[in-house]
Amino acid sequence: MGLRATSLHALRLAGLLAGLWAGNAAAISGNEQVSLAGTGQFEQLVSALEKQAASEPMKVADWHALCYSYFRIKRYDKIFSCLDQLDKALVARDKRTRLFGLDDATPTSLLMRAETFVEIAQYSAAIDQAQRAIDWYTKDGESEKDILAQALAVQAIAYKNLGKPDLAQQAAQKLEATQVNAYTDLAIGAKSLALARVNMALGRWQKALDALASDKTLGLRAFVDNITSGAFLKGLNNWVWLELPRGYMQTKAQFELGDIDRARAGFDKLLDVPQLAANGEIYWMVLSDRALIASKDGDDAKAIAFYRKALDVIERQRASINTEANKIGFIGDKQDVYARLVALLFKTSKFSDAFEVIERAKSRALVDLLASKSSFAPPRAAREEKLDIVEILGQQGRYDAALGQQSEAVLRSFAGGNAPRENTLKLALPAELQSLVSVSALTEAEIQKLLSPDEALLSYFANGNSMYAMVITKDSTFGTAINAEGLENDVRRLRASLAKRLPVETQLKQLHTRLLAPVESQIKQRRLSIVAHGALHYLPFAALFDGQQYLAEKYSLRMLPSASVLKYLRPARTNDFKAVLMMGNPDLKNPAMDLPGAQLEAQALAKDLAGSKLLLRADASRKAFIEFAPQSQLVHVASHGEFDATNALSSGLLLAPDGATPGRLTVSDVYQLALDAEMVTLSACETGLGRIASGDDVVSFTRGFLYAGTSSVMASLWQVDDDSTTFMMTRFYQHLRTMGRGEALRNAQADTRAKFAHPYFWASFYLTGAY
């Protein structure tokens, strides 16, 4: 069954494959449902049950089977609404299920919600749902200790991921104290797996092994089930779905404990199991760990091959957020696979290959960010072709899931009956949308074709204490490793010094020495596009200082979320803006949040820019933005901004509310807009000085406006003094009349620097998108 089944009801696998309850015939019979689920064909089960739901009433057992199938294939767009239907059915109908042969589906609904919340990093909600399952156990199901074990495991893992180790430890102790008889209690298997998951999450590898070993009757139960279900006579093993995650956890623990020989043999044995390929999350982790061992063995070629295969498995799946990995408590970081492969490719001087993997990693990060989002505004090409973007996203997700299950029949059904092709659905998407829903990084050669002769691209890729910098020009590629130890703290200290307007020249010079000096000899061009990564998203590159000049004095700069976005940027058509939306100092119903300087800024700029629609205070609302921004060539917003490092799509601009409707314009909202703006300027926004996170929040906000149809976005890394901001914005728009956007920003920064010398005043603004 795979990791999900073991997470919910490991000891009821026999009930899944052999135990059916008597009931009336359905559109798809109970036997067929059990057979499809037991063989992992969840896409086919979903298809059949969705047709049934559209044509006739569904029993609790049917809703449970459908929800569980969504749960298995990561249909985040449908799982919660399905569970809502299941909960409604549970109020008035027979509560029994076919899958797992449960008398009451209530706790499984709660646990599926809890597990899904963990997957999408909503840990507080996961803890709440798990507690409701515990409450159900206390009230109605004290014999159902597997429910208690799984709920406590969810809480322990969620608390750990929330950074609350004491509460995680408390949940782990409650789980460990749960009394089960090692030889007679059917919940021993559930407790064993739950303890193993928790101990892996907490990095307690020996305890994870001990937990797995505590289930002393697994072999006997598997043998009995294979006999009673008839699998033995067919040469099948129903329990391979339980044995795979147990085998992975055991081998992973051995590896982490330094037993490399046993781990190597264990991973090789797992790779020989045909069903492993149908469990994508475990599959990529096995491949990644096997690559690590090959690397330790000194076999770089084999390690590279394993890593490439792991990436193929990862990228075949629809974007997901730590799916199976959370279920065993070990957060298998997909980005580590990219980073380790990049390190090996650098080691073997395969810089072109390394660059492409770096681009795939950054593309994947964006896919993961958008994984749980199902509503997008069509990009320009899609609007013209009248494509149903949400439906295409759903088709792409189902197709990717089918690929992950390795089911030829399902693949053929999505490929129109022909042999499956990975790009069948992807080819139906506009290029702009392809970059959002699939890993479609450009190659080095494709990037070089997009660069102008006077432009260089500088791309960084960070992972832990390792960092790699690559310079790509029209006709050359250069790469080098950089020591990133302490870099995040250096950026944090710089930001703190900037906020206090302390002397920063020494810090800026040190950062220049670390980040630019190793590559600057390769940069002969005047224009420089920088692709930051990690903490570097919060670094004001314009202010880096070589002892003589700031970087902004030497180059016309722009920031890009990835090099591959070059293909999708809309070129600047004009800087002579005829329709301007100017919003400033929205009334947030809190005097402490007023920005009188932003209001003066908006008023001054509106006078200088013909055709401006000026909206201030209560008029500067979210509703007004959504109404007027699509009609504007230039959108300038001078307001507060809040960036959520834990949930980038919730980051937003604080605009005036409309009655009871909040005024927050989120990144998620931006992805649903249909703009045709030449430029969006976000003035007075701040990411929060001193806070360094993954950087995805900064990327996602600017990329959201690019996706919505904006050619260029100018934003700030921190809130700046009112006078200097107004001065700089005025100079920027004046320079735009005679030069490109990158040069206009560079010259506006120079003008501001002459009047306000400290980098705090002039270095916060950066350009993304078209020059």
Q: Over which residues does each language-model region extend?
A:
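N-terminal leader/linker segments that initiate helical-solenoid repeat arrays
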Residues: A25-A65, D104-A105
